């Protein structure tokens, strides 16, 4: 059984995909819902029970037209319910067999998901000669100028990396990475810039992470997903905020033969397992990064933005970094330097669907984006 929470805006398409009678589709769509879930591979008995229980609380469970004939052992469906209806349905399912108790627990995690935090900008600073976006590449002098400008603009999160993680990039020697960082780290520590903003180190090397944390960085952004025991030990010693990003393989080969049986189910398992590991190391201040563009195709990236609220069930802030990435180019046909509009479109929808942190290259435009977004949120 696989459960994926859908954006309510996707209800019409989800109903058409399942294929109930047209008159039933129209009736279900008119109910006006707070929660929509796509439930896959549900046993027949559970399907029939869930249908009746959902209707009994005022919701509905859309099933394929031939489900009533009970020809198949498993069925997919779309669950539609308001928050109140879902609360009552969870109680009913909790005492039922055929896997419905597990379903109730899964639904409850979504019902209890917290509202997103006030959105924040995480500015990207790359001390690399090969970052995919040329204007984000800085030497130490230019990088320091940029940091001071960002601080004047009120930026409170700054992510600094000295090794490219773009697709097909090679893993570099940590000594090269650390040499690129040295001057920046000294300035941040000596001038106490860490009192003005939180600095994040973007690295997959434990020794580089330790070096940055010793210089008062307070966020560890490990793009390998905390795969190494060494990185976990460093995190345990310094207790930074940890950014846990979903990916597969390494930057060099992550876009080769990308395949998921079910993207959301596999990401759920990934985050659950990794969060358990981090908890064992007494690390609880965690931000989840969906890994937009990391081991994902265009359709994966777009689905993650559209149904981002699915991951709110983990009760962690969600980070999205779609800034100028290839998916935008595939849609618009534009090169990286001309992808600002596409970036803003994706990031606005990410905020609407639960993102708390946007990792961005274009600071001024995103400051304006968040101002407008917050104004809309506050408007009656």
Curated annotation (Swiss-Prot):
<feature type="binding site">
    <location>
        <begin position="359"/>
        <end position="361"/>
    </location>
    <ligand>
        <name>(7,8-dihydropterin-6-yl)methyl diphosphate</name>
    </ligand>
</feature>
<dbReference type="InterPro" id="IPR000489">
    <property type="entry name" value="Pterin-binding_dom"/>
</dbReference>
<comment type="function">
    <text>Bifunctional enzyme that catalyzes the formation of dihydropteroate, the immediate precursor of folic acid and the reduction of dihydropteroate to tetrahydropteroate.</text>
</comment>
<feature type="binding site">
    <location>
        <position position="289"/>
    </location>
    <ligand>
        <name>(7,8-dihydropterin-6-yl)methyl diphosphate</name>
    </ligand>
</feature>
<keyword id="KW-0274">FAD</keyword>
<keyword id="KW-0289">Folate biosynthesis</keyword>
<keyword id="KW-0520">NAD</keyword>
<keyword id="KW-0479">Metal-binding</keyword>
<feature type="binding site">
    <location>
        <position position="325"/>
    </location>
    <ligand>
        <name>(7,8-dihydropterin-6-yl)methyl diphosphate</name>
    </ligand>
</feature>
<keyword id="KW-0285">Flavoprotein</keyword>
<dbReference type="GO" id="GO:0005829">
    <property type="term" value="C:cytosol"/>
</dbReference>
<dbReference type="GO" id="GO:0046656">
    <property type="term" value="P:folic acid biosynthetic process"/>
</dbReference>
<feature type="region of interest" description="Dihydropteroate synthase">
    <location>
        <begin position="105"/>
        <end position="380"/>
    </location>
</feature>
<feature type="region of interest" description="Dihydropteroate reductase">
    <location>
        <begin position="1"/>
        <end position="104"/>
    </location>
</feature>
<dbReference type="InterPro" id="IPR006390">
    <property type="entry name" value="DHP_synth_dom"/>
</dbReference>
<feature type="domain" description="Pterin-binding">
    <location>
        <begin position="119"/>
        <end position="371"/>
    </location>
</feature>
<dbReference type="InterPro" id="IPR016227">
    <property type="entry name" value="Dihydropteroate_synthase_prd"/>
</dbReference>
<keyword id="KW-0560">Oxidoreductase</keyword>
<comment type="similarity">
    <text>In the C-terminal section; belongs to the DHPS family.</text>
</comment>
<dbReference type="GO" id="GO:0004156">
    <property type="term" value="F:dihydropteroate synthase activity"/>
</dbReference>
<dbReference type="GO" id="GO:0046872">
    <property type="term" value="F:metal ion binding"/>
</dbReference>
<keyword id="KW-0288">FMN</keyword>
<dbReference type="GO" id="GO:0016491">
    <property type="term" value="F:oxidoreductase activity"/>
</dbReference>
<feature type="binding site">
    <location>
        <position position="221"/>
    </location>
    <ligand>
        <name>(7,8-dihydropterin-6-yl)methyl diphosphate</name>
    </ligand>
</feature>
<dbReference type="InterPro" id="IPR011005">
    <property type="entry name" value="Dihydropteroate_synth-like_sf"/>
</dbReference>
<feature type="binding site">
    <location>
        <position position="202"/>
    </location>
    <ligand>
        <name>(7,8-dihydropterin-6-yl)methyl diphosphate</name>
    </ligand>
</feature>
<keyword id="KW-0460">Magnesium</keyword>
<feature type="binding site">
    <location>
        <position position="126"/>
    </location>
    <ligand>
        <name>Mg(2+)</name>
    </ligand>
</feature>
<protein>
    <recommendedName>
        <fullName>Bifunctional dihydropteroate synthase/dihydropteroate reductase</fullName>
        <ecNumber>1.5.8.-</ecNumber>
        <ecNumber>2.5.1.15</ecNumber>
    </recommendedName>
</protein>
<dbReference type="GO" id="GO:0046654">
    <property type="term" value="P:tetrahydrofolate biosynthetic process"/>
</dbReference>
<comment type="pathway">
    <text>Cofactor biosynthesis; tetrahydrofolate biosynthesis; 7,8-dihydrofolate from 2-amino-4-hydroxy-6-hydroxymethyl-7,8-dihydropteridine diphosphate and 4-aminobenzoate: step 1/2.</text>
</comment>
<dbReference type="Pfam" id="PF00809">
    <property type="entry name" value="Pterin_bind"/>
</dbReference>
<keyword id="KW-0511">Multifunctional enzyme</keyword>
<keyword id="KW-0808">Transferase</keyword>
<dbReference type="InterPro" id="IPR045031">
    <property type="entry name" value="DHP_synth-like"/>
</dbReference>
């Amino acid at each position: 059984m696989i459960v994926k929470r859908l954006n309510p805006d996707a209800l019409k398409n989800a109903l058409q995909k399942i294929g109930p009678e047209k008159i039933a589709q129209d009736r279900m769509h008119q109910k006006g819902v707070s929660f929509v879930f796509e439930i896959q591979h549900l046993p027949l008995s559970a399907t029939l029970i869930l249908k009746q229980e959902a209707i009994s609380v005022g919701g509905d469970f859309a099933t394929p037209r031939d489900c009533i004939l009970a020809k198949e052992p498993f069925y997919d469906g779309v669950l539609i319910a308001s928050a109140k209806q879902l609360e009552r349905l969870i109680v009913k399912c909790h005492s039922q067999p055929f896997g419905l108790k597990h379903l109730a627990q899964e639904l409850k995690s979504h019902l209890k998901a917290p509202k997103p935090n006030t959105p924040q900008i995480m500015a990207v600073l790359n001390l690399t000669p090969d970052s995919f976006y040329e204007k984000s590449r800085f030497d130490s002098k230019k990088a320091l100028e940029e940091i001071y400008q960002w601080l004047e603009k009120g930026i409170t999160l700054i992510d600094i990396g000295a090794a490219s993680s773009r697709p097909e990039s090679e893993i570099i020697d940590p000594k090269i990475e650390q040499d690129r960082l040295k001057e920046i780290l000294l300035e941040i520590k000596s001038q106490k810039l860490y009192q003005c903003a939180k600095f994040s180190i973007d690295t997959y090397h434990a020794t580089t992470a330790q070096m940055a944390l010793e210089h008062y960085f307070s966020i560890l952004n490990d793009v390998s997903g905390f795969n190494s025991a060494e990185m976990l030990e460093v995190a345990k010693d310094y207790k930074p905020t940890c950014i846990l990003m979903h990916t597969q393989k390494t930057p060099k080969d992550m876009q080769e033969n990308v395949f998921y049986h079910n993207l959301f189910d596999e990401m759920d398992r990934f985050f659950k397992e990794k969060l358990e590991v981090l908890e064992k190391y007494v690390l609880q201040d965690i931000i989840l990064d969906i890994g937009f563009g990391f081991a994902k195709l265009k359709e994966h990236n777009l689905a993650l933005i559209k149904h981002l609220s699915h991951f709110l069930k983990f009760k962690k802030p969600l980070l999205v970094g779609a800034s100028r990435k290839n998916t935008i180019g595939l849609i618009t046909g534009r090169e990286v330097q001309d992808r600002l509009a596409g970036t803003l479109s994706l990031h606005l929808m990410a905020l609407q669907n639960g993102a708390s942190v946007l990792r961005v290259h274009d600071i001024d435009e995103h400051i304006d984006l968040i101002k407008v977004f917050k104004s809309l949120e506050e408007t009656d």
